[in-house]
């Protein structure tokens, strides 16, 4: 795999079959992007989809958002690392112990897999948080969980671009920010409530940009990826 890749773009293989995902991968250059495998794709096709993408020289972000008791979370993260995953995530709300143990399990087994946490899903807003019993607002919850993630020595968090500036100031420049909800100006917002353009997200402090439909549903995905990279 191309460990020297310098692109911030992670293409999300969401709502796609294995055949469609591999057909898309065959149109893209692994030197220009990484690929994200989420719950649906992984549940349907398992490790084989990851292996097939690795065979095409892509680095893979396994977006399974593990959320369980500490040992189960740590073992799941370790299993992902053993697949050769570039990056994997957990829910910060699983707690400090789960995150810390997962990171330590990677270190104990000499894996350099990036481990990041999800604070608040980008589909959620203040009203959605109130429905779950969190009443002090989106910003407070994101900041609280990001700080907990840093304390657990994880590599970064998933966050919206609107949260990036504050989180860089709060957690430091080395704390990686992975931003979904990236759209071009003429794209539909779909189910993301906190969205941003690629260039603005980087300006705001995001390190990696998760881009799905803008590329996967394009007539020419490779050309669309090039257009996005040129816009940066």
Swiss-Prot record:
GO annotation, cellular component aspect: cytosol
Top enzyme category: lyase
Positions that bind substrate: 14, 36, 63-72, 122, 183, 192, 212-213
Pathway connected to this protein: Pyrimidine metabolism; UMP biosynthesis via de novo pathway; UMP from orotate: step 2/2
GO molecular function, one term: orotidine-5'-phosphate decarboxylase activity
SUPFAM superfamilies associated with the record: Ribulose-phoshate binding barrel
Catalytic reaction equation(s): orotidine 5'-phosphate + H(+) = UMP + CO2
Keyword entries, A-Z: Decarboxylase, Lyase, Pyrimidine biosynthesis
Domain of life: Bacteria
Gene3D superfamilies linked: Aldolase class I (3.20.20.70)
Pfam families for this protein: OMPdecase (PF00215)
GO terms of biological process kind: 'de novo' pyrimidine nucleobase biosynthetic process; 'de novo' UMP biosynthetic process
Record's subunit section: Homodimer.
Described function: Catalyzes the decarboxylation of orotidine 5'-monophosphate (OMP) to uridine 5'-monophosphate (UMP).
Protein name: Orotidine 5'-phosphate decarboxylase
Organism: Psychrobacter cryohalolentis (strain ATCC BAA-1226 / DSM 17306 / VKM B-2378 / K5)
């Amino acid at each position: 795999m191309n460990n020297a890749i310098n692109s911030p773009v992670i293409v999300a293989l969401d709502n796609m079959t294995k055949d469609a995902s591999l057909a898309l991968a065959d149109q893209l250059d692994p030197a220009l992007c990484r690929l994200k495998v989420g719950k649906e794709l992984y549940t349907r096709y398992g490790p084989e989809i990851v292996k097939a993408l690795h065979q095409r020289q892509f680095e893979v972000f396994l977006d399974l958002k593990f959320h369980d008791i500490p040992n189960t979370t740590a073992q799941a993260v370790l299993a992902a690392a053993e697949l050769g995953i570039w990056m994997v995530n957990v829910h910060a709300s699983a707690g400090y112990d789960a995150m810390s143990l997962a990171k330590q399990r990677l270190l104990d087994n000499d894996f350099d897999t990036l481990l990041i946490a999800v604070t608040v899903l980008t589909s959620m807003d203040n009203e959605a948080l109130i429905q779950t019993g969190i009443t002090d607002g989106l910003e407070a919850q994101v900041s609280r969980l990001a700080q907990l993630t840093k304390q657990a020595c994880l590599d970064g968090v998933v966050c919206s671009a609107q949260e990036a500036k504050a989180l860089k100031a709060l957690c430091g420049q080395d704390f990686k920010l992975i931003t979904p909800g990236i759209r071009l100006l003429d794209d539909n917002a779909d189910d993301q409530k906190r969205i941003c353009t690629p260039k603005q997200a980087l300006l705001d402090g995001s390190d990696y940009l998760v881009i799905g439909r803008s590329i996967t549903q394009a007539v020419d995905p490779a050309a669309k990826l090039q257009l996005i990279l040129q816009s940066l």
